[in-house]
């Protein structure tokens, strides 16, 4: 799909939004060549399982990601870790005396995965604050990230925090994911729109592991993903999310907010899966 950072079920909603605005979406294609044709135009050649194709465009945007730039740090004696990023401790020290580092060039403490590399602006700002305070003699510690992200695609907003099910491999958990569709506010009040919410949790303990949300821009997607992010930071269970005292007025929400409706859906799915496991064990026994 267009937004591969989401599960396909939610990513397909983003793909549909792009197509709704008249754009052709070619996934599973490899760009094999880009060449100027004159007159400010560019010819782009692609290859996929369905064959080769070409198109002419006025503008070509190439997005190939980022990588850490570490030459200066390596020359100073710093060590490199995941993805070639600079190894730092929780105080953002590099191990080289009087040298701190922060941002996209350093490894990141992920509150679920441990040490990883997660180049995000929000993370960089927090790390920079920690590094600056400690340079001045402080004792600040970076509390860690849960990878919260949000993006606007035309009239749609997509967000995620924590882990998707396939990303939980390094953890000793029994991951379960449930997708729920819930309205952003009470349906009897005009303008209600659906949110598609995916919740991932540990089927054994109920611990929240991650969430994804896709919905219209008016539906406070960023606020709702931040609710899940806060719960992840505090190591809450999915049941704890259901118990949160969240704000409510009919134009803006429901007595059970959409995030809580999704959490309830996950709880029912987990209970059913656990009961099925018990029944299976009884049959085998």
Predicted regions and their residues:
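FAD-site-proximal beta/loop scaffold in flavoenzymes
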Residues: 55-134, 227-230
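Flexible, glycine-rich terminal cap/loop adjacent to redox cofactors
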Residues: 156-161, 170-276, 280
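General small-molecule cofactor/ligand-binding pocket signal
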Residues: 24-26, 100, 176-178
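A short, glycine/Asx- and small/polar-enriched loop/turn
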Residues: 36-42, 95-96, 190-195
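A Rossmann-like FAD-binding core segment of flavoenzymes
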Residues: 1-90
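A short alpha-helix-loop-beta-strand transition element characteristic
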Residues: 79-82, 138-149, 173-174, 178
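Rossmann-like dinucleotide-binding cores of NAD(P)H-dependent redox enzymes
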Residues: 1-33, 118-124, 141, 146-166
């Amino acid at each position: 799909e267009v937004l591969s950072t989401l599960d396909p079920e939610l990513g397909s909603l983003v793909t549909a939004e792009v197509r709704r605005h008249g754009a052709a979406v070619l996934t599973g294609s490899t760009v094999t060549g880009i060449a100027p044709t004159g007159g400010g135009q560019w010819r782009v050649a692609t290859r996929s399982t369905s064959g080769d194709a070409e198109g002419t465009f006025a503008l070509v945007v190439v997005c190939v990601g980022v990588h850490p730039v570490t030459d200066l740090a390596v020359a100073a004696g710093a060590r490199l870790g995941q993805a070639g990023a600079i190894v730092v401790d929780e105080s953002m020290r590099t191990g080289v005396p009087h040298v701190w580092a922060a941002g996209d060039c350093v490894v990141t403490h992920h509150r679920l995965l441990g040490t990883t590399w997660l180049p995000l602006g929000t993370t960089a700002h927090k790390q920079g604050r920690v590094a600056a305070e400690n340079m001045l003699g402080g004792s600040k510690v970076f509390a860690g990230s849960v990878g919260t992200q949000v993006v606007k695609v035309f009239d749609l907003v997509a967000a995620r925090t924590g882990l998707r099910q396939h990303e939980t491999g390094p953890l000793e958990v029994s991951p379960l994911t449930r997708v729920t569709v819930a309205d952003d506010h009470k349906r009897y009040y005009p303008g209600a729109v659906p949110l598609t919410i995916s919740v991932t949790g540990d089927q054994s303990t109920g611990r929240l592991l991650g969430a994804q949300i896709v919905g219209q821009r008016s539906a406070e997607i960023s606020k709702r993903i931040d609710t899940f992010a806060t719960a992840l930071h505090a190591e809450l269970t999915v049941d704890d999310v259901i118990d949160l005292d969240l704000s409510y007025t009919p134009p803006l929400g429901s007595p059970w907010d959409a995030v809580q409706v999704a959490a309830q859906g996950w709880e029912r799915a987990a209970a059913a899966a656990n009961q099925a496991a018990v029944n299976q064990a009884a049959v085998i026994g």
